[in-house]
Regions:
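GNAT-family acyltransferases
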Residues: 1-98, 105, 123, 155, ...
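Short glycine-rich hinge loops at helix-strand junctions in the catalytic core
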Residues: 111, 128, 151
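Conserved acetyl-CoA pyrophosphate-binding loop and the N-cap/start of the following alpha-helix
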Residues: 107, 111-119
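Conserved GNAT acetyl-CoA-binding A-motif
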Residues: 124-135
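Conserved active-site alpha-helix within GNAT-family acetyltransferase domains
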Residues: 114, 138-156
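Active-site acidic-Proline motif in GNAT/NAT acetyltransferases
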Residues: 101-110, 139
Length: 169
C-alpha cells in the first residue's frame, strides 16, 4: 500500500524512471543536475539534502523556507513527492501555500494526490501548522478537487491561484 515516507535511496531506480516521464517536473537543489543523480553517490547527496532541508540552519536558496520533504512510494516504487513548508513568506501566501505535491504522470488519475494530501495533514499538524494553506492554478480542476475532498475551504483567488485552507486535525 502506498505511503508517505522520508526521502530514501531505496527508490533510486524508480525515481529516475519517474523524472524521465514526459510532463513530470521534478525539483532538486540548484547545484545538482539530473546527470549527477543517475549515480548512486549523487542521488544519496540529493536525498541527504532533502532530509536536511527541514532544519532552520540548512543551506537553501534565497527566499526558500525550511520544508519537510516526503515521497509517496509503494515499496521501492516512487509515485510522487510532497513538501510541507514550515512557514509562509509573502510569495508563498499568494502562490505556493504550505503544501506542494506532484504525482508522476504514469500514476495520475488514480487517487494518489488525494491520498498524499490526506496523509500529509498529520505531518503538518505535528509541525504546528493548522490549518494548512494549499493552492492550485485556477485551471487545474483535478488539484482543486483533491484540495476540496481534503476539506479545503476556499478563501480567494490571487494571481491565477485558488487558495484553500485545509484543517490538519
Amino acid at each position: 500500500m502506498p505511503e508517505l515516507v522520508r526521502p530514501t535511496v531505496d527508490v533510486h531506480e524508480s525515481w529516475l524512471e519517474a523524472v524521465s516521464e514526459p510532463g513530470y517536473e521534478p525539483r532538486w537543489a540548484d547545484d545538482l543536475q539530473l546527470a549527477d543523480m543517475t549515480h548512486p553517490e549523487g542521488f544519496a547527496i540529493y536525498v541527504r539534502r532533502q532530509l536536511q532541508d527541514e532544519h532552520e540552519d540548512a543551506p537553501r536558496s534565497r527566499g526558500m523556507v525550511p520544508s519537510t520533504h516526503l515521497w509517496y512510494v509503494d515499496g521501492a516504487h516512487f509515485i510522487g513527492r510532497l513538501s510541507i513548508r514550515h512557514r509562509l513568506t509573502p510569495w508563498l501566501r499568494d502562490y505556493g501555500g504550505h503544501i506542494g505535491y506532484d504525482v508522476r504522470p504514469s500514476a495520475r488519475k488514480q487517487g494518489h494526490a488525494s491520498a498524499m494530501l490526506r496523509q500529509a495533514l498529520p505531518w503538518a499538524a505535528k509541525l504546528g501548522i493548522d490549518p494548512v494553506l494549499v493552492t492550485c492554478d485556477v485551471g487545474n480542476v483535478p488539484s482543486r478537487k483533491v484540495i476540496e475532498r481534503a476539506g479545503g475551504e476556499f478563501e480567494d483567488e490571487r494571481h491565477g491561484k485558488l487558495r484553500y485552507w485545509v484543517p490538519a486535525t
